[in-house]
């Protein structure tokens, strides 16, 4: 059964900790939640004393939302059935999570959202990226080889991807039928290209935070940040990682870390630090320093977490699966999937990316 209290706690943690937006900042804000569903995010805003309007086209979802705020005695939230593009006005904080990739034209939807944000206001969105969802897109294509009707899709998806469905149920706090509908049956999964997202938002929208966080080589002095005004794709390395992802981050780090290598690295820095007496260093520190350097050279650890090697294996398995889509029957495809080491394992990519942008007039 759906545990509202647990889900609110998880979602509040995403906003406050993962996305660095303290919940106390919601106090007094006028907020609009587009495609609010059953109202979880809107309730979080309302519990933190914001004035909230939640809209969704689904009357059943709105009915559930209204029941929840009645039970919680929240008078500062109003839920209304409305079409996405009919919602007007400007707000301090606009949100729409796990929704716009289901629109026929997601970028048109994003453009509509950005127009609803006041200057100095915030836009909170989550959606599927095309790169993060390469594996999900392949799943959907494969399932449709064996039938287009809903019941056929339910049956085939459970045959081909049972572990993926179970994982989504467990971590997504959803029913199996809802997971299968959203992942496989729903005809509209128009995932977004992140560069197009940033272009649509324009220079007035500054990235406040994202989850997962992006990772790029960053080691310039604060006085000489060469990347500050440099135009390049800051998300490329992250998107490569998200696309092939098949394990939890903790597992990947545990499998590629070396306590000996870490110790040797820090020992090297300690041995070289503050050595003002040359003779003392040469007599007592030089040989040990030399040995540590050899250890660092010869240790087989891959400090990039084997990402390049892993990605090459990942795309090789995609090539094998493409042949399976073309030639195999259901049983053959199911058996082929079981032989993969990277593809369709564990997390199978990344379903949703979260972003908070702030609007700044320039």
Please report, for each region that a protein language model flagged, where it lies by residue:
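Conserved SAM/SAH-binding beta-strand->alpha-helix loop
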Residues: 58
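Conserved SAM-binding strand-loop segment of SAM-dependent methyltransferases
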Residues: 73-84
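Conserved alpha-helix/loop element of class I SAM-dependent methyltransferases that forms part
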Residues: 3-28
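Conserved class I S-adenosyl-L-methionine
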Residues: 122-158
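A short SAM/SAH-binding and catalytic strip from SAM-dependent methyltransferases
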Residues: 93-105
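Rossmann-like AdoMet/SAM-dependent catalytic core
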Residues: 174-356
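Conserved SAM-binding loop of SAM-dependent methyltransferases across substrates and taxa
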Residues: 38-49
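A short glycine-rich, Lys/Arg-flanked "PGG" loop and its adjoining helix->strand segment in the class I
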Residues: 107-119
